[in-house]
Design a protein with these regions (language model features):
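Membrane-embedded alpha-helical bundles of multi-pass transporters/translocases
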Residues: 2-458
């Protein structure tokens, strides 16, 4: 339906996720360490904070999705205005999380919990309309695939703090391997300013197709929608995979802070690791759509997850003290899950389409909110890092190195859990029903279904 997306449209959509990820990656990588090492909060309490935030998300996300779905389109569209409405508050809330006022442990614990939950709520206000925006920009499968790749690229650029922060903020302590809280706060202020500027450009360069907005402008009954979702094997399995893939990414990022700082004693290598981990994505980008047309999304994921599972198993069993062997194996882990990282949002679109196909209703905002909630549950799963690190006896006040027992525990924590999560993803993708053949059938029948609905509304 309608004209093709322009390069400007793709760029506008891409950079919005860059802005989102500028703060998001810092939360996933450094918040646990900030809480334990700067604020002095125990690992168990940090994990509890993350889980409380996710419990609130279980209530907040579906409600937000239904509210967005009910919103009537204005002159600037249905979803685009949220980029500005929520973008600036999101940037400010990210800074507030890393603002330390006193040395009082109780106050700091309550404050960081409150600001983190606030950040999560505003992130939902941003992410649900932003994700839904892709579904009303185009209904063409190849363009949706391109938007998903574009979003992955944008998210990758948003990980720039992971490249620079080890150099900027990991400079404290006698050995220069500890986090500096003041530097982290200043760096977050710079990040927030960049986010605001990017949101302005993104809003200006994106567009919505009125006919697709019309299809999505249906009355929402959240209870019946959730019942439909629970009965939909495609939606359930892909939502779980979406949550697990972000759990793996964030878990590894968070665990690597301890692994590189304590086990390998080379904090700066986290930047090298990040570059190596994104190489598979860079290699795949030009070929993603060709791969989909030839083999299908599910089929590619089955092979990819198998590669990742083997590489992560070797990494765990090998207990490698050579950091380069660990990084090389990480390349293959990321190679295997790279396709789903690139195409996760296109596959989200597929399961929204599947819901429309089987129910006759198109409720992308509510559907997307549920999918986003599962990804937030993935974040919560990744939040067990400080709990596990504390359980193995990690001492943040240790003079010099941790004990060998703790160091071995850090390595196991960093490699065993990702292996188990990847195996679980492999099982789920085998259960996912949308094969290449089934997806093609769905799109053909949906096209007829939509044309009939639009004709009946004229």
């Amino acid at each position: 339906m309608g004209d093709k997306l322009s390069a400007k449209n793709y760029i506008g959509y891409t950079i919005c996720d860059s802005a989102n990820n500028l703060a998001f990656c810092v939360m996933g990588t450094y918040l646990a360490t900030y809480c334990t090492d700067i604020l002095g909060i125990t690992g168990a309490v940090v994990t509890a904070i993350f889980w409380i935030a996710r419990i609130w998300d279980a209530i907040n996300d579906p409600i937000m999705g239904s509210l967005v779905q009910r919103k009537k389109p204005g002159k600037n569209g249905k979803y685009r205005p949220f980029i500005l409405w929520s973008g600036f508050p999101l940037a400010v809330s990210a800074v507030l999380v890393y603002t330390k006022f006193t040395g009082n442990l109780t106050f700091n614990t309550i404050y960081v919990a409150a600001t983190y939950i606030l950040y999560g709520m505003i992130y939902t206000v941003m992410s649900v309309p932003y994700g839904s925006l892709a579904m009303v920009m185009t209904d063409k499968e190849n363009e949706r695939g391109n938007l998903s790749v574009a979003r992955a690229i944008g998210g990758g650029f948003g990980n720039i703090p992971q490249l620079l922060f080890p150099i900027i903020v990991m400079t404290g302590g006698e050995d220069g391997q500890q986090m500096d809280g003041k530097r982290l706060f200043c760096a977050m202020c710079v990040v927030a300013i960049a986010m605001m500027l990017i949101y302005i450009i993104s809003y200006s360069w994106t567009k919505e197709k009125p006919e697709l907005v019309t299809l999505s402008n249906e009355e929402v009954h959240i209870t019946s929608t959730l019942k439909d979702i629970i009965k939909d094997r495609a939606f359930v399995t892909m939502s779980l995979i979406g949550g697990l893939v972000i759990a793996i990414q964030m878990y590894i990022s968070s665990a690597n802070v301890y692994l590189f700082k304590d086990f390998y004693r080379k904090s700066g290598f986290s930047s090298i690791y990040l570059i190596i981990s994104y190489l598979p994505l860079a290699v795949m980008i030009p070929f993603a759509n060709k791969m989909i047309r030839k083999w299908g999304k599910k089929e590619i994921c089955v092979v990819g997850f198998s590669i990742s599972a083997i590489a992560s198993l070797i990494s765990w069993l090998g207990h490698f003290t050579n950091i380069w062997i660990y990084i090389i194996l990480a390349f293959f882990v990321n190679l295997g899950i790279g396709f789903v990282i690139l195409e996760v949002w296109a596959m989200c679109g597929d399961i929204v389409d599947h819901q429309e196909w089987v129910t006759g209703k198109r409720e992308e905002a509510t559907n997307y909110a549920v999918f986003t909630f599962m990804r937030k549950m993935g974040q919560a799963l990744a939040a067990i890092v400080p709990l596990l690190i504390g359980a193995i006896g990690y001492d943040k006040n240790a003079i010099g190195a941790q004990t060998q027992e703790v160091l071995d525990g850090i390595y196991t924590v960093s490699t065993l859990v990702p292996f188990l999560l990847i195996v679980l993803m492999l099982v789920l993708i085998l259960l996912y029903p949308l094969s290449k053949k089934k997806s093609e059938q769905m799109q053909k029948e949906l096209q007829i279904q939509r044309e009939e609905k639009l004709a009946s509304q004229e």
